[in-house]
From Swiss-Prot:
Catalytic residues, chain numbering: K73
Catalytic reaction equation(s): shikimate + NADP(+) = 3-dehydroshikimate + NADPH + H(+)
Alphabetized InterPro entries for the sequence: Aminoacid_DH-like_N_sf (IPR046346), NAD(P)-bd_dom_sf (IPR036291), SDH_C (IPR041121), Shikimate_DH (IPR011342), Shikimate_DH-bd_N (IPR013708), Shikimate_DH_fam (IPR022893)
Protein name: Shikimate dehydrogenase (NADP(+))
Organism from which the protein derives: Streptococcus pyogenes serotype M28 (strain MGAS6180)
Length: 292
């Protein structure tokens, strides 16, 4: 990267903590090199206490954009000038664009687009499909919004203590009003309803942290009768590459099992385009993710 750096190099950042596990610097810097773009991508260990100063730094230094991850995806909202329609619905941001470096910051959420592009890459369409989605944190909400925007017939959301999540209930109401998709919210502790939903679904999406450390030995589905030859199972966790859920689904004959690496790639590609105006060379970047 040092050969590419110059007095004209444009900086893109990542604001999150922890950041050491992030695939983003490798992805974006390799993409800049492939396209000959005079950009550099750096990760900064920033939590909510330093976030306001960091955002002011984006404005002051003319940083062209930033990715935002935990714990800053919701905390950054009041620090921005505008939000995309999806980010406003979700109530979270993972990409900030500083157009022309002039300090007007617009927040976007690319998690949903990334998930849907990952599914499409595997030949999975969500249009007119019934989908069960577990976990309605920032990523889960973004995926739910994109599923509705892309024409899913029905989305059955499940989350622990779901009835206490007023923000999610508001999202459900808005999606039912704004789209033709039927969206419902139920408690994940209601295993009868959860199992019934999966039995009637074409696609099950796990957007919880179950399956990654320290929960790597757990799975939301443990009943083999729930796994059918026409069921697609998508776990947004990418490390480990095969979670216990995906291994269980594969062993019991699911139509297809998909991990979160594709979502990482395509949400990054969408952020890349928002900031640079260029398409990320995803075919060249995809092999890098397999090294992890």
């Amino acid at each position: 990267m040092s050969e590419r750096l110059s007095g004209h190099t444009l900086l893109v950042s990542l604001l999150a903590t922890p950041i050491r596990h992030s695939l983003s610097p490798k992805m974006h810097n390799e993409a800049y090199a492939k396209l000959g773009l005079d950009y550099a991508y750096l990760a900064f260990e920033v939590g909510t206490e330093q976030l306001a100063d960091a955002v002011q730094g984006i404005r002051a230094l003319g940083i062209r954009g930033s990715n935002v991850s935990m714990p800053n995806k919701e905390a950054i909202l009041p620090l921005l000038d505008d939000l995309s329609p999806a980010a406003e619905l979700v109530g979270a941001v993972n990409t900030v664009v500083n157009k022309d470096g002039k300090g007007h910051l617009v927040g976007h959420i690319t998690d949903g687009i990334g998930a849907l592009r990952a599914l499409a890459d595997e030949g999975v369409s969500v249009k007119n499909k019934i989908i069960t989605l577990a976990g309605v944190g920032g990523a889960g909400k973004a995926i739910a919004v994109q599923l509705a925007f892309d024409g899913a017939k029905e989305i059955r959301l499940f989350n622990r203590q779901a009835t206490r999540l007023s923000s999610v209930q508001k999202l459900v109401t808005k999606l039912n009003q704004l789209t033709r998709t039927k969206v419902t919210l139920q408690d994940l502790e209601d295993q009868t309803a959860f199992k019934e939903a999966i039995r009637e679904s074409h696609l099950f999406i796990d957007a919880t942290s179950v399956g990654m450390k320290p929960l790597e030995n757990l799975s939301l589905i443990t009943d083999p009768e729930l796994i059918r030859p026409d069921l697609v199972v998508f776990d947004i966790v990418y490390s480990p590459a095969e979670t216990k859920l995906l291994a269980f689904a594969r062993q019991h004959g699911a139509q297809k099992v998909i991990n979160g690496l594709g979502m990482v790639l395509y949400q990054g590609a969408e952020a890349f385009k928002l900031i640079t105006g260029q398409d990320m060379p995803v075919d060249a970047i995809k092999p890098l993710l397999g090294d992890e």
